[in-house]
C-alpha cells in the first residue's frame, strides 16, 4: 500500500460541475487554457495529460510541474475536476495517480484499448483495468474508463459487462454519450444501465453516426444529432453530481475557435441544466 498525504478533493455538493478538457486549448499553455475556461463560464477543468496529443502536465516531470498547475488553477479560479491520461501503461498511471493525489483531482480517465468483439482482448482489458483500479485506490483516486469506438468496451452492453466484473469502489464509468451514440444507441436511454457506477462524463455533440465525431466545431454541444437535453435530463433525474467535462478532439484550434466552442457549449449545457432545475 502506498501512503500518500493528499489534498482535499475539490468538488462536491448536489449539483453537477461543468468543465472543459484542456485538450481543446492544446495550442496554448495551461495558464491560458484555465483563464479561457473560466472566462467561458465553466466551474473547472479536466487536465489533459495525453502523450502525443496534449500534455498540460507532463507526467514524467509532474513533481516540478504540478505546483505550477495548481497555482495557475488558483489564479484563474477554476477547480481541477479530473485528469485524462488515456493510456493504461502502469508506470505512466502511477505518475498520474500521484500527481492527481497532489493536485486534489479525484478522477483519472482512461480508454479501454483492445479491439471490439474480440473476447481475448476483452479479457485482457478487464484484467488490466482491475489491476489499475487497485493501484488507483492506493493513491486515493478513482480510475474511470469510457466506452470507445473500436475498443474492447464500445457500447452499453460491453460497459455493463465490465462493471459487473470489476466490483471495486476505485473503478467507475466515464460515460461519453458521443461514443454510445456512435454504437447505435440512444445515450439518454442507455444511461440507466450504468449510472450506479458513473464517476465522470465526457461530453460533446456529434453530427451523423461516425465513426468520427466530426470536426471540432461540429462537436460543440447543441450542433449535432445527439439528444443532449434528454441526456442531461436522465443525468438530473438519476441524481448524478459528478463532473461533466467537454472533450473536443481534432486539429489544433486558434484561441478564437476554441473559445467559441467552449462558450457556445457552456451556454447550451447551462441552459439545459437551468431548465431542469440543476443549476
Where are these regions (language model features)?
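Short, well-ordered, mixed-charge alpha-helical segments that flank or form enzyme active sites
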Residues: 117-119, 151-154
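Histidine-acidic metal/acid-base catalytic patches
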Residues: 7-22, 26-44, 67, 74, ...
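Conserved anion-binding
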Residues: 142-152
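Structural motif corresponding to the early beta-alpha repeats
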Residues: 42-43, 47-142, 179, 240, ...
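Active-site-proximal beta-strand/loop segments in catalytic clefts of secreted hydrolases
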Residues: 23, 86, 111, 146-148, ...
